[in-house]
Curated annotation (Swiss-Prot):
Residues 33-44 have a biased composition (Basic and acidic residues). Phosphorylates and thereby activates certain drugs like acyclovir (ACV), valacyclovir, and famciclovir to a toxic form, that leads to successful suppression of the infection, while the uninfected cell does not have this ability because it lacks TK. Mutations in thymidine kinase may induce HSV resistance to antiviral therapies in immunocompromised patients. The most frequently observed resistant strains are unable to express TK and are avirulent in animal models of disease. Residues 1-44, 260-280 are annotated as: Disordered. The keyword Protein transport does not apply. Homodimer. The keyword ATP-binding applies. HAMAP family: HSV_KITH. It comes from Human herpesvirus 1 (strain HFEM). Used in molecular biology as a selectable marker to identify transfected eukaryotic cells. Used in cancer suicide gene therapy to selectively kill transformed cells. This is Thymidine kinase. Keywords: ATP-binding, DNA synthesis, Early protein, Kinase, Nucleotide-binding, Transferase.
Length: 376
């Protein structure tokens, strides 16, 4: 049998989990799918890959937690894909993050119009999203079906991503819409560009009390950032709605069937922290769909124009297959790391598609980090 890079070290990450007493307890929004086949397909003979996307509002402690987790494994069996800070600051445009915060500040101060702000924000968000979208496209041919057995061996490779493409193509545009600096039409344009959800997409969202979140955000130093409490509230709201939306869709919810339950065009109030799969299916009014009952998107008869309805169909199709986990960040960095490690034991692996996929994926991830990571 051929040897793949990472096989000789594949148990290092798993051993770290066992040494901390972590079980295979599932805390995702959707139960693990059992796909026990009577015949072994050729794909099932390939090594497996675990992809983990650490996402959620900025300033919770995602990067610190991820770096501590990565340090537990060997260089060969776990690879970190950081935020593409160099692309945002240099390669794609000049100081994109600073431009976004400055534009919002100028809008809030009445120095520019909402229309002018929307032009800048939309352009900047394209720059933010490009590295995520293109990396997902390059990775996609190597992702096979989900390894559904609950007794799957440790993966040959674990990829830890600092955010999924939906952060740049859905969540932050939606938050900017709530802030008045992006149009709902632009948000749905980004939604239409969200890549198809690959099998084994494990997304970790975060929970942290707002006062603790503000304190952490105030203490961190990121190039170009401002402490914008209104934006923090908006992005927390959006990620809460995202978690609800996945639960709603996986619970059988249909936005088209339930659209009539939405009334008016009011933005939903601030919700609670994202929840796991406990409790009943959320109401459509507590999901992202409620954001798009906006006058700009409605025909004279009150229905959505078809082009915008199709975009919401895309949104539902992209979010429904995701495996969403909730990490409690209201603990020490080491505690967050250990909690994240425990979550990984219940995540969904995928088979790769070719014998050369594992080294190719490693090279892709390291090239991304080397060329676009913050160290540059």
């Amino acid at each position: 049998m051929a040897s793949y890079p990472g096989h000789q070290h594949a148990s290092a990450f798993d051993q770290a989990a066992r040494s901390r007493g972590h079980s295979n307890r599932r805390t995702a929004l959707r139960p693990r799918r059992q796909q026990e086949a009577t015949e072994v397909r050729p794909e099932q003979k390939m090594p497996t890959l675990l992809r983990v996307y650490i996402d959620g509002p900025h300033g919770m402690g995602k990067t610190t937690t991820t770096q501590l987790l990565v340090a537990l494994g060997s260089r060969d069996d776990i690879v970190y894909v950081p935020e593409p800070m160099t692309y945002w600051r240099v390669l794609g445009a000049s100081e994109t993050i600073a431009n976004i915060y400055t534009t919002q500040h100028r809008l809030d101060q009445g120095e520019i119009s909402a229309g002018d702000a929307a032009v800048v924000m939309t352009s900047a968000q394209i720059t933010i999203g490009m590295p995520y979208a293109v990396t997902d496209a390059v990775l996609a041919p190597h992702i096979g079906g989900e390894a559904g057995s609950s007794h799957a061996p440790p993966p040959a490779l674990t990829l830890i991503f600092d955010r999924h493409p939906i952060a740049a193509l859905l969540c932050y545009p939606a938050a900017r819409y709530l802030m008045g600096s992006m149009t709902p039409q632009a948000v749905l344009a980004f939604v239409a560009l969200i890549p198809p959800t690959l099998p084994g997409t494990n997304i970790v969202l975060g929970a942290l009390p707002e006062d603790r979140h503000i304190d952490r955000l105030a203490k961190r130093q990121r190039p170009g950032e401002r402490l914008d409490l209104a934006m923090l509230a908006a992005i927390r709201r959006v990620y809460g709605l995202l978690a609800n939306t996945v639960r709603y869709l996986q619970g059988g919810g249909s936005w088209r069937e339930d659209w009539g339950q939405l009334s008016g065009t009011a933005v939903p109030p601030q919700g609670a922290e994202p929840q796991s799969n406990a409790g009943p299916r959320p109401h459509i009014g507590d999901t992202l769909f409620t954001l798009f009952r906006a006058p700009e998107l409605l025909a004279p008869n009150g229905d959505l124009y078809n082009v915008f309805a199709w975009a919401l169909d895309v949104l539902a199709k992209r979010l429904r297959p995701m495996h969403v986990f909730i990490l409690d960040y209201d603990q020490s960095p080491a505690g967050c790391r250990d909690a994240l490690l425990q979550l990984t034991s219940g995540m969904i692996q995928t088979h790769v598609t070719t014998p050369g996929s594992i080294p190719t994926i490693c090279d892709l991830a390291r090239t991304f980090a080397r060329e676009m990571g913050e160290a540059n």
